[in-house]
């Protein structure tokens, strides 16, 4: 047999047809989701406090970069396992160079009881980095504006602050939630006498948009398709009712305002997304049921779990893995939540060997299950259905923003592990956009709206935003709510 052979046993063929229909998102459903998505974007700009809606957080970036920005800027990106420190040289003419170092965050530090320990560590890394770049001593007249990429839920009343709402990514440090993280860091920076001043605190999605706009002025939106999903775009101040009466007079109603949507929470009210019983189970058994509804159907974190649940369901019907009893170690693995990650689907989709031998090895190595060719073909097809649904739903956020802002021709800057590593994701997303906007017969490379690989959002994006805020501050203009 070959991977192109569609012959499955009658019972599995019937099962696969059921899942093909269940996971296919027709164009009319996409239109329905997009229409409601636009309503949610508008509602978030009007209020943003509805727990079933999209927060639509103003990011306090009030200009577009035009590629002429110059200067040397520091950027830090606090991830779950590493701290990345980047020196960004903005050269103008849409060009830049970077120098960077990654510092491993000791695991105990993510749950330390002393909040100063984390910020001491970050400041020490900044000092080590600067000294490595200036072995003869840091110039006495140097001042490095710092772009701080802080990709944790935070409230911002200005570009220079970020009040942590809740820790994620394995961090759980007391006395930081509810506090502004910028002074906590700058206290440690100042103790070391480092010539650093805060230039901006940003989210990685905002940075993705701005970094890409710096090099490509057709960029209108930044998106993350990874373990989480998110989008950022520029709206107009006049379109954000929740800010009216709260801004200084120097901010023009026509001014652009970068919005960090945090639209993983789209449709938390479960009105339009085509959820299956498996999606409902994932939500019900998650730490936060009823939250991040869109993320749970599109992000890399959940795709492996979807496949696991369907395989387990098929096994319990007696259709696959027939030689293994429910008490066997192999089935215990299959019953373990989140035992499979998205790489399992990626490998299944990418395997073009005649007997699907790569998939066979994955089953042997991860689940210790010996599979038949038909079982492997079944799982490969399931992976295709799950991956295609995620890609088609993912473009609903892009389509909603483009329709709302009347962007007829633009680029969407995309980053994240699913976009970069999942087979056929970009092509399926492009096909979804084509179906929504009616581009039949137009080659993908000629589509009016194109998804492009983003520039480094958490490094270069943070630096460009720091440059924009520095220029605005030099003019004496405001960058936040009225005090």
Predicted regions and their residues:
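ATP-binding/phosphotransfer module of carbohydrate and carboxylate kinases, centering on a glycine-rich
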Residues: 1-100, 104, 108-144, 190, ...
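Short glycine-aspartate micro-motif
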Residues: 71-77, 143-147, 200-202, 220-224, ...
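A short acidic Gly-Thr/Ser loop motif
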Residues: 76-84, 151, 205-206, 224-228, ...
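Intrinsically disordered, low-complexity regions enriched in proline, serine, glycine
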Residues: 86-87, 96-97, 157-159, 198, ...
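Glycine-rich phosphate-binding loop of actin/hexokinase-like ATP-binding domains
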Residues: 95-100, 169-178, 209-308, 312-314, ...
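Glycine-rich phosphate-binding loop and adjoining helix at the ATP-binding site
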Residues: 103-123, 154-213, 220-221, 237-265, ...
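Conserved beta-ketoacyl condensing-enzyme motif
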Residues: 146-156
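Hydrophobic transmembrane alpha-helix bundles
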Residues: 171-187, 229-246, 365, 438-459, ...
